[in-house]
């Protein structure tokens, strides 16, 4: 029964994409900004780690490491789990109990703790092992120093508030994770 639900979700997603209705509103400007953020190694502490470090394009946006855990931005510190692929994460439902299957379904991360792409996008940025930033203010300061900060302001508007800027960052990351680049539906079964 679970397989049927997953197939239905994939089919519905491909219908949405083919009709020109992406799963995330925002269009190509936000997606392009999100891609820059996703690949920016200056957003970690210390710098050198990006979202793409653990979600490698060459591995289907999954962890390049084939072991159960991966090293984060700080040398010698390891995450609790290997990074899962972000492909098709835009179509994962919020965590809920399915009475018919008598099991929990959905949610992002291995344990389903995150209800949305925007929420999920912020977790690694503030995780002391993954990207090592202490707080949203630290992330905001780094984003303000990037060459694409002007583009972010054009899309979202100016803000001096770290919480708002962090929300803009996670929204752009969610837009990129909802893009056709990450959700291509190119399998022969997607036709």
PLM regions with names:
Residues 19-191:
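Periplasmic c-type cytochrome electron-transfer domains
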Residues 5-14:
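Sec-dependent N-terminal signal peptides
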């Amino acid at each position: 029964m679970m397989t049927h639900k997953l197939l239905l979700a994939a089919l519905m997603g491909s219908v949405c994409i083919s009709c020109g209705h992406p799963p995330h509103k925002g269009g190509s400007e936000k997606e392009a900004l999100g891609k820059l953020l996703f690949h920016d190694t200056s957003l970690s502490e210390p710098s050198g780690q990006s979202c793409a470090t653990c979600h490698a394009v060459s591995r289907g946006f999954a962890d390049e490491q084939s072991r159960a855990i991966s090293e984060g931005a700080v040398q010698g510190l390891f995450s609790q789990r290997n990074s899962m692929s972000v492909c098709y994460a835009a179509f994962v439902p919020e965590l809920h109990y399915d009475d018919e299957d008598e099991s929990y379904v959905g949610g992002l991360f291995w344990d389903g703790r995150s209800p949305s792409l925007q929420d999920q996008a912020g977790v690694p940025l503030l995780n002391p092992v993954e990207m090592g930033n202490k707080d949203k203010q630290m992330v905001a300061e780094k984003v303000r120093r990037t060459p694409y900060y002007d583009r972010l302001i054009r899309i979202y508007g100016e803000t001096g508030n770290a919480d708002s800027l962090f929300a803009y960052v996670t929204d752009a990351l969610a837009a990129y994770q909802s893009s056709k680049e990450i959700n291509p539906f190119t399998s022969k079964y997607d036709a």
